[in-house]
């Protein structure tokens, strides 16, 4: 039970905060049922991973009488939840008439079907990514280990799924998906980024890949790499313009390197050394490295710390 002094203040505190909600700012909206449900979208990621990797991430709710029966039930659940969330996202932030709502529901159903039709294409890309992980990491003992445990493959899986929704112009949901992966893995890949086959992320923590980045085939990124935009005063006026670099085939970028700018192209077969800061194009086959800083070594008895 609350102390008398605090209990007597609850009414006034409530009224003060309610009054603050009337200021008309974006943060003052009270429409919790007119926005996509993040928890449902996270649950959808789990269902989609089970569709993509049918031998892994089993849900005990689905009893496997046959692969077809199990998959049919899983796809039905996924389609139902996804089309509901897409419809909410399409309505979000706007007033919708009853007639328009019916059109939105039809559009959401069409988007859901078109997205699910892309699952085989996504799986084909992920099969190449899985092979790139295995070929590129001698510490990997099996493909099972990579699928189950590697954060890089989780981030890429979520991104490839979210990218298909992004291409369908589904609002909000692709970003919710990739930010979930970001929180789980420390790998921040915008759903708008275009990524080719055989993509390998080693370790991965701290990697940032911006919206208009183009990554070609067989690219390898190490932890802490940024494929970003140059900071300008353009702000929202730059939306829709190329702001992020293009990374050619078979490029390797080592830890801590930053490659920035929409006009920056890293040519095929180039290697970018750790901690490099690049804002201009690099020719194919080049090796870029930061000159080693000089190390000073002294005996501990001469060091006052």
Region locations from a protein language model:
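Terminal amphipathic alpha-helical/low-complexity segments used for targeting or macromolecular assembly
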Residues: 1-176, 303-305
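Short, conserved active-site entrance elements at the starts or edges of catalytic domains
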Residues: 165-197
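Left-handed beta-helix
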Residues: 185, 190-191, 196-197, 202-211, ...
